[in-house]
Amino acid sequence: MEIRNLANELNSLPYHGRGIVIGKSEDGKNAVTAYFIMGRSANSRNRVFTERDGAVFTEPFDASKVEEPSLIIYAAIREYENNLIVTNGDQTDTVYDFLKEGRTFEEALETREFEPDAPNFTPRISGMLTFDEGDFTYKMSILKIKDPQTENWI
């Protein structure tokens, strides 16, 4: 299998959207995760990543230009106990809250759907790494629209 450079792959695309990467370092000793975003609208492009209280948040670069804050301001990466949650939207907090209640990643995401940003209906992408005894497992989910006419989703 050919190993490719993710930055080069993304930079070769005119629009790469949002994405989550979960895996291991080349030597297999460390977990690796990455979250990247690129916006279509001026509202989506008006954001930066900030770190505070052990979490990574998206925040507006220029607060005076925010049009729809619910779609661009959220915790993107958050820890709870031995879990690292990474998502492309405010479902990070949904997963976090469910875990705090003793519930699961899957139960949390069953309460959510794609983003309400017609006509794009941006998929909600979520991942969770669970660390245990020097290794980790992970789960991923994508909630996206199946049929824009009926708004059925998968």
Give the location of each predicted region:
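Conserved short alpha-helical segments that host acidic/polar catalytic motifs at enzyme active sites
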Residues: M1-I154
